[in-house]
Amino acid sequence: MAFKTLDDLLAEGVSGRHVLVRSDFNVPLDDEGNITDSGRITASLPTIKALIEGGAKVILSAHLGRPKGEVNPKYSLAPVAEALSEALDQYVALAGDVSGEDAHERANGLNDGDVLLLENVRFDPRETSKDEAERGTFADELVALAADNGAFVSDGFGVVHRAQASVYDVAKRLPAYAGKLVQKEVETLAAVAEKPEHPYVVVLGGAKVSDKLGVIEALAGKADKVIIGGGMCYTLLAAQGYNVQDSLLQEDQIDNCKELLERFGDKIVLPVDLVAATEFDAQAENKVVALDGIPEGWQSLDIGPESVKKFDEVIASSKTVFWNGPMGVFEMEAFSKGTAGVAQSIIDATAKNGSFTVVGGGDSAASVRLLGLDEEGFSHISTGGGASLEFLEGKELPGVKVLEA
């Protein structure tokens, strides 16, 4: 993929220039508005620091949550501005709006090396509009903030699969460059997508099988084995004839799953035991059961210990591993062992086998941090869940494609 990078921009010189950066600051917050996982902020720092050192007037844009196109204080980027100020050891101002009067005044008042964070771009309904002309008017307003010989740096890999104003349309209006994070993500995932070393093992989890049928199909054609756990495995087990009781089940997908198993049954690896509970609750009574042993009215919330062993045997022989999605409800300690076990197997494969191991962002990356696992134990932890999946599936990512123009 041929696109200009931050290094190219720095070589051209950024001193005194406005540089608009699309970052990914979609971080989880607790009820008090405190950031509970700052991984995405940390991942954005190399690009921001390089621009500060180059003397750029840095304007950061990002979204947080789903405010549905209207201003909602719950989704303000104020906690992010505070976290950035601390991480960069310099004040990061938060604009009082996205592209309005306050944003313009602050952007015009920036000195070389200053950083301004715009308020949540999704406070404006045009950001996510399906109408290109509508998005374009918003993109024009964002571009107008970069009045001093402006440039655009795309550094939010978690959003490059979206054709949104601050990701896609802005890149068509300014000289556009891939930031350090986007460059690293694309190069790493391209290595997995184009020339994975075999055996190549894909580990998929998460809630809905309907969201990942296309992914399973695409990756099963390239991988040697596809391990499936998490909520999505119950519809596949039902397709094999098991009664999954009250476990998460998409009945309308059973026929699709049957077809998938017929085509790729030799590659798909499913759990052999489960952890069932009386209800979806951290304190619920629970026990390890066989696939056909879920008590009536109970639901499975994790894979069992024999499944972890079975999956470990497959992962242990790998040379490339891509993992996206937890094996169970990892946020609840009683149902976190499957995810922790599989993650540890991947870490072991990295260390003992020299396997190239990639964690595909989203809940998988969050689980690594929440469970206190060694982040350095993986070859790469992606910041983009949906983006990394779509990339490996072979789909075109609008926010990357536009950089090649």
Curated annotation (Swiss-Prot):
The protein's name in its UniProt record: Phosphoglycerate kinase
SUPFAM superfamilies documented for this protein: Phosphoglycerate kinase (SSF53748)
Binding site for ATP: 212, 331, 361-364
A Pfam family recorded for this sequence: PGK
Domain of life from the UniProt record: Bacteria
Keyword terms: ATP-binding, Cytoplasm, Glycolysis, Kinase, Nucleotide-binding, Transferase
Coiled coil: none
Reaction catalysed by this enzyme: (2R)-3-phosphoglycerate + ATP = (2R)-3-phospho-glyceroyl phosphate + ADP
Enzyme Commission numbers on file: 2.7.2.3
Lineage per the UniProt record: Bacteria, Bacillati, Actinomycetota, Actinomycetes, Mycobacteriales
A GO CC term assigned to this protein in UniProt: cytosol
Complex and partners: Monomer.
GO biological process: gluconeogenesis; glycolytic process
Subcellular location: Cytoplasm
UniProt enzyme class: transferase
